[in-house]
From Swiss-Prot:
The keyword Repeat does not apply. It comes from Bacillus subtilis (strain 168). Keywords: Cell membrane, Membrane, Transmembrane, Transmembrane helix. This is SPbeta prophage-derived uncharacterized membrane protein YosE. The lineage of its organism: Bacteria, Bacillati, Bacillota, Bacilli, Bacillales. It is a multi-pass membrane protein. It comes from the Bacteria. The chain crosses the membrane at residues 20-42, 58-78, 95-115. GO terms for cellular component: plasma membrane. It is found in: Cell membrane. Its main location: membrane.
Length: 115
């Protein structure tokens, strides 16, 4: 194999590997967001609706929560673009996103303690 062919193949493998990593990070972020949506709607909002309005059978399934999580991940987190975010790599963005999602889950859990 000559040098040009090696460069093409190495670029192909690096590009496809980075696409797989980015796809996995987006999946993990969406899964975390879906767990927050699932927990928040079923364990925080559901008791409030039952106590306040006597509404029964409000239950969000995990696939519905995953779709809501994906939509939140795409529309809410995909909209904001700043100069600071352009300089960060994908791992810093995913870490910040997972940190914010985990913080939201902890806040939801603490709020259920006071219901």
């Amino acid at each position: 194999m000559n040098k040009d062919t090696k460069d093409i193949w190495s670029g192909f493998f690096m590009g496809s590997g980075s696409l797989i990593v980015v796809g996995l990070l987006i999946f993990v972020e969406a899964l975390t967001m879906s767990l927050i949506v699932y927990y928040g709607l079923n364990h925080v909002l559901n008791p409030l609706l039952i106590d306040t309005y006597n509404i029964q059978n409000v239950h969000v399934t995990l696939p519905h929560a995953f779709v809501i999580g994906v939509l939140l991940n795409v529309f809410v987190k995909g909209v904001k673009r700043s100069d600071q975010e352009k300089d960060e790599n994908i791992f810093k963005k995913a870490g910040k996103s997972l940190f914010h999602s985990t913080f939201a889950l902890i806040v939801l859990y603490v709020s259920t303690l006071f219901i």
